[in-house]
Amino acid sequence: KMHKSYHERNLTCQQGWGIMELADQTDQSMGIPFLTRNSEIMAAGGVVGILILMVMPLPPFLLDLLLSFNITFALTILLVGTYLLKPLDFSSFPSILLIATLFRLSLNIASTRIILLHGSEGPAAAGNVIKAFGNFVVGGNYVVGAIVFMVLVIINLMVITKGSGRIGEVAARFTLDAMPGKQMSIDADLNAGFIGEEEAKARRKEISREADFYGAMDGASKFVKGDAIAGVIITLINLVGGLAIGVLQNGMDIADAAQTYTLLTVGDGLVTQIPALMISTAAGIVVSRAGSQSTLGREVLSQILRQPKAIGIASAVLFGFALVPGLPAVPFLALSMIAGGVAYTVIKSKKAEQKKSEEREVIEEKTRPRERLESTPLVDILALEVGY
């Protein structure tokens, strides 16, 4: 009976801990009541809506809205990644990466449809967002736009995606290799009484979640790589198909068709490749935050300012560049003055802090009570008499 009562209390305690943990996660992640009540419906509706975009023709204003939302969503994910303390704070990132990739490909299909069907009507036929990226971003020069698009694809595919995928692969491998040692350490702390049963369960669960997360990120990086390759193929299809439709079906001149469809195709490629670059950067930031103790900006700034001598040497080197004939003196002098001012301020603050700590130690030494010989208690003499 006593064993059953203890088992019931333990089960009730575990359920209470689970409910409290779920409530804390809900309170921390969702502060808006509407999103809290309808989060599952919104997620399912979003996925279904993404699939509908692949087969449903969109008007230009709705395509503008969705393209703007894609840029906003990618920027939000990137900023969330910079404020993470540890990767498990964003454990849903692999699923978000898959959904974002699918959404971006759906927008590519929708924009391809509208470019091929209505591209002969002019640059505004595919919406104002694609027109703006085709005209304003690349100055209306489709050759420059094509070069910029290919550069972005190479950066995304060969640099960021490859690097983040390698980080995720290595992190997953080392996390799995370190799991037995971490489990033994938790068991040793539990047996020694340093931690309780609930804390041991929480640590084991966190280790398992960490291994699952890095394994999922290792696979999710392939989505980004495939998305970049698909973006290049879709761009080529838009260009070749647009030229064929414009010249053969709509009777356009070859030069006009090349300028119109190339401008629309490059604008479409840029408006989808820039969010892809943001998501890839966010993936690299998230998987590289394994041993961090603070946010990205605070951690980088504190670690750089920890070495003011290096900043001072960089200031001297920049000043030397300013004296080289042919190099612009004003930018190098300005950067040299800024770096020198930062180094001087950091060194001065460190010296002031060191002086305060020394003064504090002197004051503590003076106020510390000293032991005196007079205050030593007297020892009673003990005598033992044997016999008479």
Task: Place the predicted regions along the sequence by residue.
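Hydrophobic alpha-helical transmembrane segments
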Residues: 40-47, 51, 55-71, 91-101, ...
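Conserved glycine-bearing catalytic or ligand-binding loops at nucleotide- and phosphate-handling centers
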Residues: 179-182, 276, 283-284, 329-360
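Non-transmembrane accessory domains of multi-pass membrane transporters/channels
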Residues: 190-194, 348-388
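Membrane-spanning helices that line or support transport/gating and their immediate boundary helices
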Residues: 62-65, 109, 113, 162-174, ...
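Transmembrane helix-loop junctions at the membrane interface of multipass transporters and ion channels
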Residues: 51-64, 82-88, 111-143, 249-256, ...
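Membrane-interface segments at loop-to-transmembrane junctions
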Residues: 29-38, 67-68, 85-103, 129-140, ...
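Short, positively charged and aromatic/hydrophobic N-terminal segments
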Residues: 1-10, 14, 19
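Gly/Lys-enriched N-terminal cap/neck module of very large, oligomeric protein machines
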Residues: 21-139, 168
